[in-house]
């Protein structure tokens, strides 16, 4: 398992590092470049000619590494790949519409939400009614030794919001160079450790968590995500040479969501993915506050734009958000000790 984890990590990492420059050149050649909102921070206009849709290579690297190093007879592998590819296609359509029509709107919110929801519902149906693994009707509560049993309808609803919510939250967070990809690495690292423990009878008993037989292979997929994300960061760090686009943010967010669902760690995801939660809540609060008072609470949302407009340098803001995400990852790992 550990050897396959390492090999999966390096396979996806090397694919990103080898093909990244070629993809950047190709995207520049065909003018597949970031569309900047006219009402956004002025500093973002410098990013106008930066190529986008780098998420295509992230998805490709994860798929290749997964096919090579996982056991393809495992149903959890295919459920995860379905979300990765399906959400990637939705993001691809969204990105293409932005580039074709030369605006930052892309798919309408209704169409995007509907497509994401349909695929999420299909996957959830397969999990709860076709595979019907006994662990799917259990819910792990972080920092508590209690496990809630026989809550199928609640679990289904939580699973839906975990997949949809995470995909959109990552999409909202992906607004600055490297801002989203590092928290993705931290969250996935946390999930990889939990999946390794959950897939081992002795370790799951020792840490007082649910034993999930199929979860072993999720560890290998997590390794592929971490490797491809690190490889992407090589080109995405400030000043970015490439952006992942919606094809990357929606697919990675959805994949993190489905992995947390399969591990019964949706509530923990709220903690370790707290940065994504903060970004999303800032948008929701802004909308509600404006509807009630007709005034803006923040200068601009997601909240990282608010700090930008307040004069915080982009690099300082990004690193501070990374620090927050790292602390949240450690907090998630602390849960394992509390569960004992």
From Swiss-Prot:
GO biological process, one term: regulation of cell shape
Enzyme class: transferase
GO cellular component: plasma membrane
Catalysis: reaction(s): UDP-N-acetyl-alpha-D-muramoyl-L-alanyl-gamma-D-glutamyl-meso-2,6-diaminopimeloyl-D-alanyl-D-alanine + di-trans,octa-cis-undecaprenyl phosphate = di-trans,octa-cis-undecaprenyl diphospho-N-acetyl-alpha-D-muramoyl-L-alanyl-D-glutamyl-meso-2,6-diaminopimeloyl-D-alanyl-D-alanine + UMP
UniProt-annotated location(s): Cell membrane
EC number: 2.7.8.13
Annotated keywords: Cell cycle, Cell division, Cell membrane, Cell shape, Cell wall biogenesis/degradation, Magnesium, Membrane, Metal-binding, Peptidoglycan synthesis, Transferase, Transmembrane, Transmembrane helix
Pathway stated in the Swiss-Prot or TrEMBL entry: Cell wall biogenesis; peptidoglycan biosynthesis
Signal peptide annotation: none
Cofactor dependency: Mg(2+)
UniProt cross-references to Pfam families, sorted A to Z: Glycos_transf_4, MraY_sig1
Annotated TM spans: 5-25, 50-70, 73-93, 113-133, 147-167, 178-198, 218-238, 242-262, 267-287, 318-338
Keyword Membrane on entry: yes
Keyword Ion transport assigned: no
Superkingdom of origin organism: Bacteria
Membrane topology value: Multi-pass membrane protein
Molecular-function GO term, any one: phospho-N-acetylmuramoyl-pentapeptide-transferase activity
HAMAP family for the chain: MraY
Main function: Catalyzes the initial step of the lipid cycle reactions in the biosynthesis of the cell wall peptidoglycan: transfers peptidoglycan precursor phospho-MurNAc-pentapeptide from UDP-MurNAc-pentapeptide onto the lipid carrier undecaprenyl phosphate, yielding undecaprenyl-pyrophosphoryl-MurNAc-pentapeptide, known as lipid I.
PANTHER family named among the record's database cross-references: PHOSPHO-N-ACETYLMURAMOYL-PENTAPEPTIDE-TRANSFERASE, PHOSPHO-N-ACETYLMURAMOYL-PENTAPEPTIDE-TRANSFERASE HOMOLOG
Family note: Belongs to the glycosyltransferase 4 family. MraY subfamily.
Protein name: Phospho-N-acetylmuramoyl-pentapeptide-transferase
Name of encoding gene: mraY
């Amino acid at each position: 398992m550990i050897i396959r984890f390492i090999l999966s990590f390096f396979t996806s990492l090397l694919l990103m590092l080898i093909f990244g420059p070629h993809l950047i050149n190709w995207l520049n050649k065909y003018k597949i470049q970031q569309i900047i909102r006219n009402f956004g921070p002025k500093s973002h206009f410098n990013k106008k000619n930066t190529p986008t849709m780098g998420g295509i290579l992230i998805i490709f690297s994860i798929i290749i590494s997964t096919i090579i190093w996982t056991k393809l007879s495992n149903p959890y592998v295919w459920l995860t790949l379905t979300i990765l590819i399906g959400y990637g296609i939705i993001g691809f359509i969204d990105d293409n519409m932005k580039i074709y029509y030369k605006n930052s709107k892309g798919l309408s919110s209704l169409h995007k939400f509907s497509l994401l929801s349909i695929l999420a519902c299909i996957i959830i149906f397969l999990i709860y009614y076709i595979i019907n693994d006994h662990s799917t009707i259990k819910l792990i509560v972080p920092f508590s030794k209690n496990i809630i049993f026989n809550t199928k309808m609640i679990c289904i609803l939580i699973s839906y919001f975990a997949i949809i919510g995470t995909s959109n939250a990552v999409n909202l967070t992906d607004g600055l160079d490297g801002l989203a990809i590092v928290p993705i690495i931290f969250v996935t690292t946390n999930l990889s450790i939990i999946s390794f423990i959950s897939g081992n009878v002795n370790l799951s008993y020792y840490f007082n968590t649910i034993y999930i037989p199929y979860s072993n292979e999720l560890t290998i997929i997590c390794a592929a995500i971490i490797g491809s994300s690190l490889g992407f960061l090589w080109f995405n760090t400030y000043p970015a040479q490439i952006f992942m686009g919606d094809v990357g943010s929606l697919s990675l967010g959805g994949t993190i969501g489905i992995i947390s669902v399969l591990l019964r760690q949706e509530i923990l995801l709220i903690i370790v993915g707290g940065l994504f939660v903060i970004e999303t809540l800032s948008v929701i609060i802004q909308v509600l506050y404006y509807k009630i008072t007709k005034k803006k609470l923040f200068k601009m949302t997601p909240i990282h734009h608010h700090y930008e407009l307040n004069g915080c340098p982009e690099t300082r803001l990004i690193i501070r958000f990374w620090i927050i995400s790292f602390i949240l990852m450690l907090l998630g790992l602390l849960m394992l000790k509390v569960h004992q």
